[in-house]
């Protein structure tokens, strides 16, 4: 029985990570659309801002997944 639960757990984790990846892309596209309408795309400031926003988004998602994994192991 433990083998089946671990397989289902890993499949659900992969599905959750796929959803999180799509959320990252959706938020990134929305923020970049806002930045492109406000800032010219060929400036150095736009490139730096785009990189910083992407880094912050990935950092926040990484922290969220870390705390979710930490809380999941504490419950067991």
From Swiss-Prot:
Function in brief: Envelope protein. Required for an early step in virion morphogenesis.
The stretches that face the Virion surface side, renumbered to this chain, are 67-76
In the UniProt record, which is one GO cellular component term? host cell cytoplasm
Keywords associated with the record: Glycoprotein, Host cytoplasm, Late protein, Membrane, Signal, Transmembrane, Transmembrane helix, Viral envelope protein, Virion
| Organism in which the protein naturally occurs | Fowlpox virus (strain NVSL)
Q: Which InterPro entries match?
A: Poxvirus_A9 (IPR006920)
Q: What is its main location?
A: virion
Official protein name in the record: Protein A9 homolog
Q: Which domain of life is it from?
A: Viruses
Leader sequence residues: 1-21
> Where in or outside the cell is it found?
Virion membrane; Host cytoplasm
Q: Which Pfam families match?
A: Pox_A9
Q: How does it sit in the membrane?
A: Single-pass membrane protein
Which family, according to UniProt?
Belongs to the chordopoxvirinae A9 family.
Glycosylated residues in this chain: 71
Instruction: State which ranges are Intravirion (membrane side).
Output: 23-45
Induction of this protein: by what?
Answer: Expressed in the late phase of the viral replicative cycle.
Q: What sections of the protein cross the membrane?
A: 46-66
């Amino acid at each position: 029985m433990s083998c089946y639960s671990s397989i289902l757990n890993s499949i659900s984790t992969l599905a959750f990570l796929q959803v999180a990846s799509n959320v990252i892309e959706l938020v990134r596209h929305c923020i970049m659309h806002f930045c492109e309408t406000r800032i010219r795309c060929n400036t150095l400031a736009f490139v730096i801002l785009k990189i910083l926003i992407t880094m912050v988004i990935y950092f926040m998602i990484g922290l969220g997944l870390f705390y979710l994994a930490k809380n999941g192991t504490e419950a067991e």
